[in-house]
């Protein structure tokens, strides 16, 4: 990785890491931010995603500033919010939460918002918010019970993982697929490239 700036991913998400790897980018370090991700009272989905992505970036930056090997690195944070109308769905941890999410999503449209926040080596903050519309098929109780039993929903915004079994529930997607997974690749790479990060440096070894 010599010859390019250091890059830190402010996330412990295997999905976000895999998406970056898909684009030929291997972070020099992972700095997951331990923050309260509870929406504030009356907070709208867009505002929530933007606020949490910024908070994660700020927390990771503090860690990077204390590390001589990483000081001056690019820092990337992201937060994904699933919403039905103005209602923000939880990042389900309990069976009842997951079941409730799936019943709410059944047979209707919902929106997935991912906010990305990039801190440049000069410690400027750059943010973008990406929205994808998703429609689920009508789920019956057998679908819900079996999916909840799979456990793949745990910790996922909206109680599902589109890259897993829940992909079979999706009737239609309008917008970025990788946004639903947790990191909109096109917008992320465009943002990095626009701030001077050598986005093609890892392509030669990508295979």
From Swiss-Prot:
Entry function: Nucleoside triphosphate pyrophosphatase that hydrolyzes dTTP and UTP. May have a dual role in cell division arrest and in preventing the incorporation of modified nucleotides into cellular nucleic acids.
Chief place of localization: cytoplasm
PANTHER family named in the record: BIFUNCTIONAL DTTP/UTP PYROPHOSPHATASE/METHYLTRANSFERASE PROTEIN-RELATED (PTHR43213), BIFUNCTIONAL DTTP_UTP PYROPHOSPHATASE_METHYLTRANSFERASE PROTEIN-RELATED (PTHR43213:SF5)
Subcellular location field: Cytoplasm
Keyword Manganese in record: no
Protein name in UniProt: dTTP/UTP pyrophosphatase
The reaction(s) this protein catalyses: dTTP + H2O = dTMP + diphosphate + H(+); UTP + H2O = UMP + diphosphate + H(+)
Family according to the record: Belongs to the Maf family. YhdE subfamily.
Record GO cellular component, one term: cytoplasm
Taxonomy, superkingdom: Bacteria
Lineage: Bacteria, Pseudomonadati, Pseudomonadota, Alphaproteobacteria, Hyphomicrobiales
GO MF, one annotated term: UTP diphosphatase activity
One matching Pfam family: Maf
Catalytic residues in the record: 79
This enzyme's EC code(s): 3.6.1.9
């Amino acid at each position: 990785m010599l010859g390019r700036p250091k890059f830190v991913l402010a996330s412990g998400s295997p999905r976000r890491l895999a998406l970056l790897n898909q684009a030929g980018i291997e972070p020099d370090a992972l700095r997951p931010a331990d923050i309260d991700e509870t929406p504030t009272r009356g907070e709208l989905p867009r505002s929530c995603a933007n606020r949490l992505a910024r908070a994660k970036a700020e927390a990771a930056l503090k860690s990077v500033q204390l590390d001589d090997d990483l000081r001056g690195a690019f820092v990337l944070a992201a937060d994904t919010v699933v919403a039905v109308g103005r209602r923000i769905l939880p990042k389900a941890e309990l069976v009842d939460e997951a079941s409730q999410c799936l019943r709410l999503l059944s047979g209707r449209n919902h929106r997935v918002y991912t906010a990305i926040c990039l801190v440049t080596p000069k410690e400027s903050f750059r943010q973008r918010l990406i929205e994808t519309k998703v429609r689920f098929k009508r789920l019956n109780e057998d679908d819900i019970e079996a999916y909840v039993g799979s456990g793949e929903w745990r910790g996922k915004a909206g109680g599902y993982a589109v890259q897993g079994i829940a992909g079979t529930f999706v009737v239609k997607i309008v917008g970025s697929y990788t946004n639903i997974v947790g990191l909109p690749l096109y917008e992320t790479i465009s943002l990095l490239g626009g701030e001077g990060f050598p986005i093609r440096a890892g392509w030669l070894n990508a295979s």
